[in-house]
From Swiss-Prot:
Modification N6-(pyridoxal phosphate)lysine occurs at: K56
Family named by the database record: Belongs to the serine/threonine dehydratase family.
Enzyme Commission number(s) of this protein: 4.3.1.19
Record's function text: Catalyzes the anaerobic formation of alpha-ketobutyrate and ammonia from threonine in a two-step reaction. The first step involved a dehydration of threonine and a production of enamine intermediates (aminocrotonate), which tautomerizes to its imine form (iminobutyrate). Both intermediates are unstable and short-lived. The second step is the nonenzymatic hydrolysis of the enamine/imine intermediates to form 2-ketobutyrate and free ammonia. In the low water environment of the cell, the second step is accelerated by RidA.
Record-given protein name: L-threonine dehydratase biosynthetic IlvA
Chain's gene name: ilvA
MF terms (GO), sorted A to Z: L-serine ammonia-lyase activity; pyridoxal phosphate binding; threonine deaminase activity
Catalyses which reaction(s): L-threonine = 2-oxobutanoate + NH4(+)
GO BP term, pick one: threonine catabolic process
Cofactor(s) named in the record: pyridoxal 5'-phosphate
Organism in which the protein naturally occurs: Staphylococcus aureus (strain USA300)
Pathway recorded for this protein: Amino-acid biosynthesis; L-isoleucine biosynthesis; 2-oxobutanoate from L-threonine: step 1/1
Annotated CDD domains: ACT_ThrD-I_2, Thr-dehyd
Length: 422
C-alpha cells in the first residue's frame, strides 16, 4: 500500500468537517499592547484556549478518527513531550480507545498529570528517554511488538491536515473582520503546525509571508532546510522549550516547509522567557515556552512588520507553575539583569559589609550568597548573585568586583560553571 506523503487544501477541508464538533473555535484577537509596541496590527490566534490548551488536539483527533474500526480496536500509541499526548488522550477517551502514551522523563509533571486527566482509564503513560527522539524510538518498538497504531505527532498527513484546520478557521475569522495578514508567525517543533498552516495559506492567502520560529537551541528545521537541504538530526538540543525541542523534523514536514515557509527565525530561550513573563503581566496570557515562540520572534522582525498586519499563533498554554522560577531566572540572565561571580572573601568580621558598601550600586540587590568558610585559610570562596536595576550598570559593577577581588570568576560567561552552580 502506498503511503500518502502530501497534504492538500482538500485534506484540510475534510479534516475541518471531522473536527467541527470536537475542537473549540479559538479566538482571533487584536492585541493592543503588541500592536502599540511594534507599530503595527498584531493579532493572536489563541490555541492556548483550546480544550487541551494547545492546537495538538486537531491533528491527534483527525489522525485517529480516520483509522478503520479494526485498527482502532487494536489500540493506539504515541510519543510526545506533552501536548500531542494530551490530544491523543482526549481522543482516546472520546472514542473509547485504549492508548499507551510515551513521554520523555523530562516532561513537566503538569503535562503528565493532564494526560492522565484527559485520558482517564483509557490511557497508560510510560515515561522513558531524556528527549523526544529517545522516547519516540521506544514507542515505535512497543507499537510494532504489540501490533498497535502509532499516531505520529507531526510526520503524518492526517496529523498535518488536522493542524491545518487552524489556518482555515483563522482565515474565516479574519475574512469576517475584513482583515488580511501580511505576516504569519508560528512555532516549529517537528513541523506539523507550520506544514498544515502554510499549505492552506499558500492557496487562500498567498501574499502572507510565513515565518517559522524555532528555539535557538533546537533549530532542526532551519538546519535541515536552509543549511543542509536535507533532513538532519541535531546531536544536541536545549530541551527548555519542551514543546518545540525536536532533534529531527519529519520527512514530510521538511518537504512542505521547504516549499512553503518564507523565512526562519531562531529565538534565544531567554528571550522566550521574557516573552512569557511579558505576556502574563501585560496581557494576562499564560503561554508555555513553545506557545510564546511566535510572539518572541516579533522583536527580530520589528523593522519589517511596522505598519503591517501580523498574526501570531499562540500554540499552547500548558505551562507548569513550578517552572516560573527558572523562567524568571533565564529572562533576567538574557536581559543582562542578573549576574553571578565566584569571589575570595577575607575571613574576618566586616568583610561582607565592605563588599556591600564598596561593590554594590545604590539600586543593586544580592539575590544569592553562599559562603564556604575554610578555617585553615585567610579567605573563603563565595558564590554571589547580583541583580541590577539597569543592565547598563554591568560595566561599572564588573570594575568594582575586579577591584575587590582581581581573581574573581564571572559565572555568566562560563556555561559549565553556571549549570553546576546555579
Amino acid at each position: 500500500m502506498t503511503v500518502k506523503t502530501t497534504v492538500s487544501t482538500k485534506d484540510i477541508d475534510e479534516a475541518f468537517l471531522r473536527l467541527k464538533d470536537i475542537v473549540k473555535e479559538t479566538p482571533l484577537q487584536l492585541d493592543h499592547y503588541l500592536s502599540q509596541k511594534y507599530d503595527c496590527k498584531v493579532y493572536l490566534k489563541r490555541e492556548d484556549l483550546q480544550w487541551v490548551r494547545s492546537f495538538k488536539l486537531r491533528g491527534a483527533y483527525n489522525a485517529i478518527s480516520v483509522l478503520s474500526d479494526e485498527a482502532k480496536s487494536k489500540g493506539i500509541t504515541c510519543a510526545s513531550a506533552g501536548n500531542h499526548a494530551q490530544g491523543v488522550a482526549y481522543t482516546a477517551k472520546k472514542l473509547n480507545l485504549n492508548a499507551v502514551i510515551f513521554m520523555p522523563v523530562t516532561t513537566p509533571l503538569q503535562k503528565v498529570n493532564q494526560v492522565k486527566f484527559f485520558g482517564n482509564s483509557n490511557v497508560e503513560v510510560v515515561l522513558t528517554g531524556d528527549t523526544f527522539d529517545h522516547c519516540l524510538a521506544e514507542a515505535l518498538t512497543y507499537t510494532s511488538e504489540h501490533q498497535m497504531n502509532f499516531i505520529d505527532p507531526f510526520n503524518n498527513v492526517h496529523t498535518i491536515s488536522g493542524q491545518g484546520t487552524l489556518a482555515k478557521e483563522m482565515l474565516e475569522q479574519a475574512k469576517s473582520d475584513n482583515v488580511n495578514f501580511d505576516y504569519l508567525f508560528a512555532a516549529i517543533g517537528g513541523g506539523g503546525l507550520i506544514s498544515g498552516i502554510s499549505t492552506y495559506f499558500k492557496t487562500y492567502s498567498p501574499t502572507t509571508k510565513i515565518i517559522g520560529v524555532e528555539p535557538s537551541g533546537a533549530s532542526s528545521m532551519y538546519e535541515s532546510v536552509v543549511v543542509n537541504n536535507q533532513v538532519v538530526t541535531l546531536p544536541n538540543i536545549d530541551k527548555f522549550v519542551d514543546g518545540a525541542s525536536v532533534a529531527r523534523v519529519g520527512d514530510i514536514t521538511f518537504e512542505i516547509a521547504k516549499e512553503n515557509v518564507d523565512d526562519y527565525v531562531q529565538v534565544d530561550e531567554g528571550a522566550v522567557c521574557s516573552t512569557i513573563l511579558d505576556m502574563y503581566s501585560k496581557q494576562a496570557i499564560v503561554a508555555e515556552p513553545a506557545g510564546a515562540l511566535s510572539v518572541s520572534a516579533l522583536e527580530n522582525y520589528k523593522d519589517h512588520i511596522k505598519g503591517k498586519t501580523v498574526v501570531c499563533v499562540i500554540s499552547g498554554g500548558n505551562n507548569d507553575i513550578n517552572r516560573m522560577k527558572e523562567i524568571e531566572e533565564r529572562s533576567l540572565l538574557y536581559e543582562e539583569m542578573k549576574h553571578y561571580f565566584i569571589l575570595n572573601f577575607p575571613q574576618r568580621p566586616g568583610a561582607l559589609r565592605e563588599f556591600v558598601n564598596d561593590v554594590l550600586g545604590p539600586q543593586d540587590d544580592i539575590t544569592k550568597f553562599e559562603y564556604l568558610k575554610k578555617s585553615s585559610q585567610n579567605t573563603g570562596t563565595v558564590i554571589i548573585g547580583i541583580q541590577l536595576k539597569d543592565h547598563d550598570d554591568l560595566i561599572q559593577l564588573k570594575q568594582r568586583v575586579n577591584h575587590f577581588d582581581p581573581s574573581n570568576i564571572y559565572i555568566n560567561e562560563n556555561k559549565m560553571l553556571y549549570s553546576l552552580l546555579i
